[in-house]
Each structure stands twice: as C-alpha cells, then as structure tokens.
C-alpha cells in the first residue's frame, strides 16, 4: 500500500500543505510536507479538529421529559366531579468527557491505593498494640502471683491466739440468736396477714367473680375507639355511679380512729364522685385543667355494645319492591343486596325494581324471615263483593267465526243476519271484531266475527278465549291456508269445540273432499271419517246449508249445557275499544254473566267509570244487557285494552282506587322487565348506532287494529333498519302528535282516522309526512318501501369491455403503450381497468391514454384496434388482457 504524505493528504482534503502542517502541530504531531502520515495520526488529527470545532459525534447531554395525565373523582356533596391530574417528570443524562473520565479513573485508582496503604498501616499498628497488651497482661499476672505468695507468708506469721478466737465465736452465737427471734416474729405477722386476706376473700369472692365476669363481657363486646363528647360524658357518669356503689359498702373502722371522729356519709361520697368526675374531665383538658392537678380517668369505655351476631328481622315484601326499599326493610346497606344479587348471577342497581320471588330469595339468603304481603287486598274485596244466592240459567252460545282472509266469514254472517256488513268494510276485509246477536226460531246466538288477516293474531286469540263454539270457515275452492291453521290452534288452545263450514259451495271448482283431507292433517276429522268435528257445506251467496249450520250450533250448545247468572251484578270481557271524537272512550263489552244496566259503576282493566249510555250492534240505545249480549258502553275514564275483564262494582271511589293501583302495578312490572344490564342486551347496544331507524307516530280507530298494526310493523324490523313506533294511540291525529312527529323526524300514519285543523297547520308548517290508510295491506307495504329506502345500497362491478395486448411500444413521455384489439364490449377512457396475465389480476388502476391511430378517443368498440397507456404501470406484455369495468349501484329491498 502506498504511503500518504502530508502534501498528498492536503490535496485530498482540499487544503494547503502549510495549513495542514499547522493543524498537525496544534494536535501535537510534528510533521513536514514530505513526511508520511499513518492512519492513527489521521484519526488523532480528526479527533482534535472535532473537539476544536465542537463537532463530537454524540451529544454530551440529553434531557428526557415524561408526562402522564390521570383523572381523579372528587366528591362534592351529592355530586362527584372529575379533576384532571397531570404529572410531569424530567430527567437529564450527561455524557462525561473521556479525558475527564480518564482523570477520574486515575484519581480513583490513586485513592484506592492510598486507602489500601492506610488499611495496611492500621493493621500493623493494631497487631503491635495487641502484642504489647499481651506482654503487659503476662507481666501483671506474674506480679499478682508473687504478691499472693507474700500475703500468705505474712498471714502465717500473724495468726490469731486462742483467746481471740473464743471471743469471736461467742459474738457470732449471739448474733444468730437475735436473727432467729426476728424471723419468728416476721412469720407470725405473715400468718396473721394471710388469715385476714383469706377471711376477706371468703366474704367477697362471689362479688369479685361477678365483677370479673362483667369486665370480661365488656372487653369482649365493646369496640374501643375515639368517642364523641356525649358518649364520653355518659361513660363517666356510669363509672362514677359504679364507684359510689363500691364506696357505700360497709367497711371495718380502723383501730386507731377516734370514737368521736365524723363518719363518712353518702353526701360526702357524692361530693367525692363529683370530684372524681371533675378530675377525669380535667385530665381530658376541660376548663379547669390548668388550675387542677391532672388525674387519669377511671374509664373511657362508651356504653354502646357492638352487635356480635346478625340481627334477623321479619321483612314484609309486596308484589314489587326496589333494591333501596328492600335494604331499608332489612336495615342494611343497599350495596350488600347488590353484592348478594351479583353472587346469584344478576346485575341490579339501587333503584331497580325486583319482583316478589326475587326479593324473597335475596332476603332468605341473607338470613331474614320473609312475610309476603298481598297488596291487592282491596281489589280482591271489591271483586268478591257480588250478589249471592242467585240461580244460574241457560244462556245463548257465543260463536266466533274464524278462518283465512277472503274465505267468506263476514259474508256468511251477513246472510245469517240478513244485513250487509262486508260491503262496509274497507277493501272488503274485516279489520275489527264485530259482535252481533241473532234471534233464530230455536233460540238466540251471539256471533263474533274476527279478522282473517295475518296481522290480527291477537284479535283471533281474544275471540277464541271469549267464545263457546268456533266456526271455522274454509273456502271449498281454496283449501286450508295459514290463518286457517292458526284458527285451529287457537280453538285447541282454548278447548273450544270446532264446527267446520265449507263455504263457496256454489262455485264450480269447489272441492269439499280436498278440504276434509287437508284438515285431517291438522287434527280436524269429519264425523263421516270417524272424527268429532261437524262439517257443514254452506254458501254465503245462495244461502245453501245456513239452516243446517244454525241447527248444528244450537245442538252443540245444548250438549255443552251453557249456563250463566242472569240477575245481579254483571261481568264480561272487552271485545273492542276505541276513542270517538264526539262520545269519548267507547268499549264493546260482551256480557258473560249478570245484567249490565245503565248507571252501573264498571271497573274495566286500568280504567273505570259510570255507564252513561249503552248501544247495541245496530246503534240503538238500550238500558240493560243480559248474558251473551254485546253492547257498546260510554263513560269510561279512558280507552281500555281489548281483552280486559269488565266488572260491575258497588262503590265508584273503590273502583277508582283499584284502577289507580292497577296502573301503578302495571308501571312497576314494566320497569321490572327492563333489565338493561343483561349481557345479551349489552351486545345489542354495541351495534345500536349502526342501525337505521324509521320513526312512526301511529293512530288508529280501534284498539284491536292498533295492536295488529304495531305487531306487523315491529315484525318488519331487520338488523339494518328498525321500525320505532314513538307514539301510538286510539283516536284522531292531534296537534301534539304532529309536534312530536316534527321533533323526532317521524312519519304520521292514520288508520281510519284524520288530523284536526290545528294538527294540519303544524303538519304544513313543519312539512311532516302524513299518510292516511284504510286497508292494512297498503299500510304495511308502504312502510316496507320506506324502510327499503333506508337500507345501505349495494355496489356491483360490471365488466363493460375486454382488450387483448398484441404488441407493446415504448413512448418517452408515457412509457409502455399496449397495442390492443378489443375482443368484447367497449373500452371507455374514464372507466377503471384491470390488467390480467394468465387470467390472474396483476394490476388495478386507470387508463392514462386511449388512442385510435393518432387521435385521442373516448371509447373503442368491439373488433377495433387501439393504443392503451396504463397509468403508473409499464410492465405490460404481449398476451396480457386489459379488462374495463364500472361500479353499478343496486337498490335493495326488504
């Protein structure tokens, strides 16, 4: 390797040779221009220059800062406030200078050497001192031995004479005799004291044992802690009283006391008690503590005794009770009940309402005795207060006509009643329960006509519950349908006999045998086939078989032996209810027993009232209605729910109390069912914000239609779109409904009702979407369409063209240009593309240029050649395929 001289190094670094020689000299290296430079010298010069210009490679000082933010909850009264706490930490690291480190290491080394030398010198000195001490000790021992020998010799020389020894012995004997006398006297005194102590112990042993027992009990039960002033004062009084009792006990008078000495009286002892109390207070730091001598108090134990066992109480629990109320009854904290409920697997809050069974389990689990209270005692008393000793009489059968929609139920009833009801129904389908009674030659029959539409399940269930016989209408040309099967299930669930009316027998395509065969698959067997169900072939249009059907109904009723109390207080069931604008709440009641009269007090579910007017199914006013008679009653406090029991009571005030109690109970039960803390609801709430909601304000003419519409609309809800009925009711659309719909961005839906003038003004000013319907089909279909508009759209990619690369050209401006032949569809300049090689997508992007010959074009059709430049992609090869596609939005529907 060639040597590097100073001149050559100066040429490489771009400096003059003289300047480089000076820098070498400053770095402590003596060089001339012709001298060679080694790598070590180069490195030494470089380090010198770095230090001189402050260009060290690594920083000598580094500061790290750390900041953490936390939240502290601070309670202020009943509220809590979150305070942010920010903690900042700063730490600085300093890198020492290598020269300083070397100096420090040298100094430390010198210090260690000096320390080692000092330790060696100290050790040598200690060894010398120990050796000197050992020599001095040996010398002292030798001197002591010599001195002892000298003393023994001197003693031997000066031994006592015989006379001196005898005198000494006599003195010792006299001293021993004196000691024996003193010892005997002390023994006698000790025996006397022991005898006195034994006598005192025998006299007071029982009392001392009792006091010791009480003291141990106090120590066991009393929890020592800092007491309040009132507790300390009470403890002092107790201690003073005990001290006075002890002082009043008779004691033996001292022998040295004079005969005329004044005896201590109770009064004086009382003063002593006060003095003791004062001394105790002074010891605590009372007002006279500075002027009196401090005396330790006798006792600071307070009078409270800590309970050592669980206090078991009788807990009275009603039908519903909140967690806070239950804790108050058990005299414990609500948190204890919450902990117990968590152990039992249920998450509750302090204000949550528990049902009676749950509260009973919790209370019994915590060791308390439970007393169940029936809060509806007044309700039982009111309903039990009936007219007695009344004989039951035969009554007319209640017949419910059920079947699939458009199978001719209402038309059949029209022919029986000789009236036109079906023509008055919107769309020709029944949307209410119609209650009618018909007088025949053989007796009276009450008919309930139920809707056959799928939405009216609850109505059909109520009809089957309040009926005696079910007539199942099946169209001979249509056969068994879904609502036909549902009607069979309702009849079987209610245990009601079933009569099958095969309708539309006048049609040429009627096939009654097919109907029998299909019904037999669902457990309905004809009497001709050995079953128990009567089959009657009828035609609502021609009247064929109507008389046979009525005879079959009356025959079945005679077999059932239907009886009811005709006189006395009435009871029945609400078949239908609505809110009439002119008449108020109107309820259709089917009387089941007794006689309902105008002026009676009626308790109807959550509502009550006095019957102000009664109308029959034809709209005529009546004053009374017996068993199996349907009537409309006016005068209730509100619209009752269809299916509620209607009962006549004696006292309007008690009826009001029962109605209010039922309303509160209904509200409590509703709250008890809202378990928001359940795990399954937790996951449902996590995706709640992703679901679109269609808000609806719904009003209908009758309660039954309202229930049916609500059930149908709620059934339309999906995972993506939810129907939210924010308000519903019976009656016309009011200004309040319109304001609510405007505030919540809801659709107003009126089913056989209209909006009043004030509501229309709000609807026009707020541009609220208002829709009227009279047929439930149309309502459900339009709501479904509105929900479809809220669905997130789907996007689909459609291939619109395919080109094959035949050759590749290079362009200096664009890059690789693919000469292509369009084999399918059309190549568009604005559409995105994919590059395929061996039918595998290798690139996805967009076109940069599209030319035919030398002209820029927007599209190239099938069978034509073109030049394609792919943006940001140059790896186009012969044989590749360029696929052009576009994204198409597809509207979704439910």
Swiss-Prot record:
Annotated spans, G3: 449-452
Species of the source: Shewanella woodyi (strain ATCC 51908 / MS32)
GO terms of molecular function: GTP binding; GTPase activity; guanosine tetraphosphate binding; translation initiation factor activity
Low complexity bias spans: 150-161, 253-266, 283-294
PANTHER family listed in its UniProt record: TR-TYPE G DOMAIN-CONTAINING PROTEIN (PTHR43381:SF5), TRANSLATION INITIATION FACTOR IF-2-RELATED (PTHR43381)
Gene Ontology CC terms: cytosol
Gene name of the encoded protein: infB
Protein name: Translation initiation factor IF-2
Keywords: Cytoplasm, GTP-binding, Initiation factor, Nucleotide-binding, Protein biosynthesis
Binding site for GTP: 403-410, 449-453, 503-506
Pfam families referenced in this protein's UniProt entry, alphabetically: EF-G_D2 (PF22042), GTP_EFTU (PF00009), GTP_EFTU_D2 (PF03144), IF-2 (PF11987), IF2_assoc (PF08364), IF2_N (PF04760)
